[in-house]
Amino acid sequence: MVCNNTGVHPKQFKLAQNTRLFLGEKYVLLRPEILAAASQSARTSGRRVVMIVTGGTEQENWVAKMLSHMAHVKPGVLLWVLSGRRLREARVLYRSRQEKAHVRFFSGLNAAEMLRRYSQVRCLIAPASTVMLEAFSIGCPLVTGWIADNQRNSLDYLSRNGLVINSGDLRNVSARK
């Protein structure tokens, strides 16, 4: 059995007899382009751009909530949204009450294009999923949290070790957080 969550201990599993357990981040299946970029020096951008990256989340609702939240936290900052599948931009903007001038949408990027975008932002907001690990592996500053329960263990470990900013439950983001 392979579990690539960071900070997981064998005692947390109930395994059938003769089951082998492979634990830790060395078993993360990152794309070759990501691994190659991770071996290079990290660079961060001074641009006033924050990127919201979706994993396998309920994308439109979550993105609209994050855009609305960011409008209160950082008014006027340029927001980029990166999603695997194309979002209905007009619907997301309407739900978030954001102006098109402050938001730019990207979707369907290959790994090289994603890495280029990551290097152009000041900070990335992502759930504690593979997209977070990809950005983390190339040194992109992160604010993260969990959307699914299986993300909590790794997130807690990375947070305890000062490696990420943990925003907790990203399903219920509000301007008061």
Question: Where do the model's predicted regions map?
Answer:
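Short, conserved catalytic or adaptor-binding loops enriched in Gly and charged residues
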Residues: K14-A16, Y94-K100, Y157-S159
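Short, well-ordered beta-strand core segments
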Residues: M1-V2, L124, L142
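Acidic donor-binding loop of glycosyltransferase active sites
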Residues: S119-T130
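Donor-nucleotide binding loops and adjacent catalytic segments primarily
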Residues: T44-Q120
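A nucleotide-sugar donor-handling region in carbohydrate enzymes
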Residues: V2-N61, E89
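Short, acidic/turn-prone active-site loops that include or flank metal/cofactor-
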Residues: N5-V8, Y27-V28, L109-N110, I147-R152, ...
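Catalytic binding pocket for nucleotide-activated donors in carbohydrate/polymer assembly enzymes
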Residues: M132-R176
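A short alpha->beta transition loop at the rim of the catalytic pocket in nucleotide-sugar-dependent
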Residues: L115, R122, G139-P141
